[in-house]
């Protein structure tokens, strides 16, 4: 509304960033259902950040994109980055099960309610699965039991997008996976001021040029 009211003038640049937490990234985009584009038929950016890009386009609705460039990679979760001697199933054959921050024991057994609707899907036939049931599942070939570095993931774990608009304005979006906590930030700079904020905190600041 403040943008529509012209409080910060014409938009020069929009910067948005989504920090995907380490436990969300590993569960959904490395071990889980959106980890492999050949199976889920979508990309990481579309699966996780389509709302961020929609929001940017909505705020820039007075103009249209003319150029888009994007770069990203599967930087972190690759076999060559696994700790020395790492197994393939964390709780079955890995000596790092108690120390690796991505081990299924630390992510799912120590926090059994974390992403439970994904991780414990194979136990939905049980009315009230016990911790013993969950431990047993994490010793099988279940996708969520795998070593984080030895999955069939092929989507990026970080990506940057740069948009050039017809008006001359620019926009950037950064998706960074593996952060300590989830965060969505935005910073909009206009000819008369700027707005920046954090969506998790529902806190936004307006600065005006005096």
Placement of each model-derived feature along the sequence:
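Glycine-enriched catalytic-core subsegment of oxygenase/oxidase enzymes
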Residues: 141-210
């Amino acid at each position: 509304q403040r943008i529509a009211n012209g409080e910060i003038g014409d938009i020069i640049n929009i910067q948005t960033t989504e920090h995907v937490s380490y436990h969300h990234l590993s569960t959904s985009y490395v071990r889980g259902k959106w980890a492999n584009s050949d199976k889920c038929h979508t990309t990481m950016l579309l699966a996780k950040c389509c709302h961020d890009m929609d929001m940017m386009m909505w705020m820039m609705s007075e103009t249209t994109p003319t150029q888009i460039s994007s770069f990203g990679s599967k930087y972190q979760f690759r076999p060559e980055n696994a700790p020395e001697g790492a197994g393939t199933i964390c709780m079955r054959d890995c000596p790092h099960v108690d120390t690796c921050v991505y081990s299924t024991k630390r992510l799912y057994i120590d926090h059994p309610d974390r992403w439970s609707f994904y991780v414990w899907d194979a136990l939905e036939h049980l009315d009230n699965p016990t911790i013993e049931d969950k431990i047993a599942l994490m010793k099988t070939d279940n996708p969520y039991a795998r070593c984080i570095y030895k999955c069939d993931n092929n989507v990026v774990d970080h990506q940057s997008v740069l948009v050039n608009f017809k008006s001359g304005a620019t926009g950037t979006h950064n998706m960074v996976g593996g952060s300590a906590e989830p965060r969505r930030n935005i910073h909009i700079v206009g000819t008369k001021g700027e707005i920046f904020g954090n969506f998790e905190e529902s806190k936004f600041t307006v600065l005006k040029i005096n």
